[in-house]
Amino acid sequence: MSRNQIREGALVLADGSVFEGELIGATPASSVASGEVVFNTVLSGYQEVLTDPSYAGQIVTFTYPHIGNYGASTADFESRRPFCRGVVVRDLARRESSYRSEAHLDAMLDKYGIPGIAGIDTRRLTRLLRDTGAMSGAFGSGDFATLAGTAAAEPGTDGVDLVAGVTTADAYTVGSSDPNARHIVAYDFGIKYSIIDHLATLGRVTVVPASTTADEVLALKPAGVFLSNGPGDPAMLDYAVTAIGELVGRVPIFGICLGHQLLSRAIG
């Protein structure tokens, strides 16, 4: 859809708060997009945020007011695609300016089926979320009552295994080809490309699916195991907690973000 064609819409939160704006990106199914509304304070790096699998199931609000000025480039993606439910911005750049840009941000969102809304008071929204915490919300072209009902019915990220939708389907290896190089096994709960790149500077990295068992990991004879970031509720990942618990004490383990929470569950 042309960026010159204005599509009026609104974001309504579960508490009834209304933010009117202009729809951008893809047209949501049934004209309504819903999810857990959160905010991110980065000044640049919006592509990295949008393609971070940790935001699966969430609607990401950017506190910085001007987003999209340098377009979009797949070289800056942190995963194979965006996994967030939606995007909220104050002002979407009408033109991108970068020799690296492959598409306007609006076009990138449309390509991957990610809806968004622009032109709203993100400062007010951020202050509200700061005080209340993440809250379910819905946005689209529907009437306020319909959006409010959808927001109220949105379960958010609790009680859902979001990792299953973002983890790799098959194991793969990157980094050093030296068979004597230090070998790290990285669990992909929603791992970012930049983390894999950093680990690869240390030796050889085998990235494995979230459902990989402890025996399968130990068969790879790793020097250490890395538990990645990822989306959603750690209480829904008993299969990962079981595997991690069986690895504790048998191989060095390091976890960040969701991986840290899962390690905490495994050791009590």
Residue ranges, per PLM feature:
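RNA-binding accessory domains that recognize and position tRNA/RNA substrates
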Residues: 1-220, 234
